[in-house]
Structures are given as structure tokens and as C-alpha cells.
From Swiss-Prot:
One of its GO terms (molecular function) is nucleic acid binding. It comes from Sphingopyxis alaskensis (strain DSM 13593 / LMG 18877 / RB2256). This is UPF0102 protein Sala_0262. PANTHER family: UPF0102 PROTEIN YRAN. Belongs to the UPF0102 family. HAMAP family: UPF0102.
């Protein structure tokens, strides 16, 4: 798969994840945010909770369990730490979530997956 095709697939997965989150009461407040230490695919808010979300797409649902690793989560957490002042208010709960997507499957939302 070319870099452009992978990028397009990632964007489609992020749109699908954002749609799913909106259906479940979340408001998308940021997308595809890059900082020197990492990247966050989506930032969502529901009430006093702000979630920094890594989105992963795999062609086979069986591969989803291997889609996320500690290295990737550390980078998302580092990016979230830099971005938190921009999206979170005092006393908000901040967490790192993962959305796993595959063809013909409902998205799987894993909440609070990273604790430093």
C-alpha cells in the first residue's frame, strides 16, 4: 500500500470513529493534531471528560488486538500532555482512548487505555 493510500484509509477511519463518537454523545473538538512529541487523531469532549483518541483501522478484525502498542500510546500520551491546556478546562477529566475499526464490524472504543 502506498503512503497516500494509507493516509486516505486513516482519514476514512478517523471520520468513521468521529461519527461513532458523536452518536454516543461526544463532541469532536480536534482532529489530526501534531506536536513535536507525537500526534493525536481525535480529541473529543463529553461533559467534563476530554478524550485524546488514537484511531486504528485494520483490514481484518483479528488484527485489531495487535494494532496498538506501548510505544504508540506513549507518543499519544505525550502529545495529549502538550495539547491538554488547549482543550481541557480546570477540573476536567483527561484520558487516552483508542478506537479500533475493521470492515463489517462496529467500532470498538477502548477507554482510558494509558496510565503513565
Amino acid at each position: 500500500m502506498t503512503r497516500a493510500a494509507a493516509e486516505a484509509r486513516g482519514r476514512r477511519a478517523e471520520r468513521r470513529a468521529a461519527w461513532w463518537l458523536r452518536l454516543h454523545g461526544w463532541r469532536i473538538v480536534g482532529q489530526r493534531l501534531r506536536v513535536p512529541v507525537g500526534e493525536v487523531d481525535l480529541v473529543a469532549r463529553r461533559g467534563r471528560t476530554v478524550a485524546f483518541i488514537e484511531v486504528k483501522w485494520r483490514d481484518r478484525a483479528a488484527d485489531l488486538d495487535l494494532a496498538i502498542d506501548p510505544y504508540r500510546l506513549r507518543r499519544v500520551a505525550a502529545a495529549a500532555e502538550m495539547l491538554a491546556p488547549r482543550f481541557a478546562r480546570p477540573y476536567d477529566d483527561i484520558r487516552i482512548d483508542v478506537m479500533l475499526l475493521a470492515p463489517r464490524r462496529l467500532p470498538r472504543h477502548l477507554v482510558h487505555v494509558w496510565q503513565p
